[in-house]
């Protein structure tokens, strides 16, 4: 079944895997999803990911990260810019939760966090926020 909003599908799969305490979750592959996974890995929200190519279709296997008490490291993940209402921000991007959380932004320089966008002086489409 075709998905109209691939980013919303991606974050929903991560959210559901965390709530179900799954070790891994499989997500259909796209270059944007791979870039987002790399960013989440660098920021410590996921344990790791691998791109798996099969005869039918490629997918990304994301390893979920949990605390010692079994609490998911992704406490909240919410889509901001949607297909029906795109949200763009200039180079003066505000901090999410006073800097405790992150906005993930698609810019001309790739997919980066709000902090990196402020440092580089670029704006873009706010894909989602994560805490």
Swiss-Prot record:
Alphabetized Pfam families for the sequence: Ribosomal_S8
Keyword annotations: Ribonucleoprotein, Ribosomal protein, RNA-binding, rRNA-binding
Gene Ontology molecular-function annotations: rRNA binding; structural constituent of ribosome
Entry keyword Zinc-finger: no
GO BP terms, alphabetized: translation
Residues in coiled coil: none
GO cellular component: ribonucleoprotein complex; ribosome
Subunit comment: Part of the 30S ribosomal subunit. Contacts proteins S5 and S12.
HAMAP family with a match to the protein in the record: Ribosomal_uS8_B
Similarity comment text for this entry: Belongs to the universal ribosomal protein uS8 family.
Function description: One of the primary rRNA binding proteins, it binds directly to 16S rRNA central domain where it helps coordinate assembly of the platform of the 30S subunit.
PANTHER family in UniProt: 40S RIBOSOMAL PROTEIN S15A
Protein name from the UniProt record: Small ribosomal subunit protein uS8
Species, as recorded: Chlorobium phaeovibrioides (strain DSM 265 / 1930)
Lineage, top ranks: Bacteria, Pseudomonadati, Chlorobiota, Chlorobiia, Chlorobiales
């Amino acid at each position: 079944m075709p998905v109209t909003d691939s980013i919303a599908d991606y974050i929903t799969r991560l959210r559901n895997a965390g709530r179900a305490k799954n070790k891994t979750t499989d997500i259909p592959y796209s270059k944007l999803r791979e870039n987002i996974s790399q960013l989440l890995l660098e920021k410590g929200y996921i344990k790791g990911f691998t791109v798996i190519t099969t005869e039918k279709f490629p997918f990304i296997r994301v390893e979920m990260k949990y605390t010692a008490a079994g609490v998911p490291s992704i406490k909240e993940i919410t889509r901001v810019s949607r297909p029906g209402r795109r949200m763009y921000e200039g180079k003066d991007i505000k901090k999410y939760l006073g800097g405790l959380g992150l906005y993930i932004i698609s810019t001309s320089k790739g997919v980066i966090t709000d902090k990196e966008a402020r440092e580089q002086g670029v704006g873009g489409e706010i894909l989602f926020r994560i805490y």
